Amino acid sequence: MKLSSKPLIYTPDWLVSFEKDIAAEVLLSLDPGEVIREYRMRYDMSQEDMGELMNLRRESISRIENGTVTPTFDFVKVFIKAVALIEAVRVERAQHKGMDVYFLENIAKEFGFSREKLPFMLKLGVESYDKKLNKIQKSLKEKEYGK
């Protein structure tokens, strides 16, 4: 992943704010590994998924999350972009019946991700959104029927 200082054309302002919020959480935390773990779990990713996303082994992700290894600044930058892109996928999924893959592809490009990573990131975003939606629907049904 390459980072550039070019102006963002496709990335919406809300997503830039989302990135800043994640950055603040990770960088200002006394336990950045725990924050990283919480985001990974929020998006329903395994350590293997996160490793594939970050081009690291699962064991490296585990060491970062457990605080044995401090995440590098480069790791944190890529992590923030990855989580933001997955959030963009989820929002796109929630707002539209069909997803604008071209839009998401352009955000991924602005974030410095290769085109080859996009299908995996789309899969992670869609699966985590669908699981969350199913959980909410199940909870509503249980409340409706008094279970």
Task: List each language-model region with its residue ranges.
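Residue-level signal for the short linker/turn that defines the boundary of a DNA-recognition helix
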Residues: 34, 44-45, 71
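Short alpha-helical DNA-recognition segment
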Residues: 44-62
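The DNA-recognition helices of helix-turn-helix-type DNA-binding domains
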Residues: 57, 68, 83-86
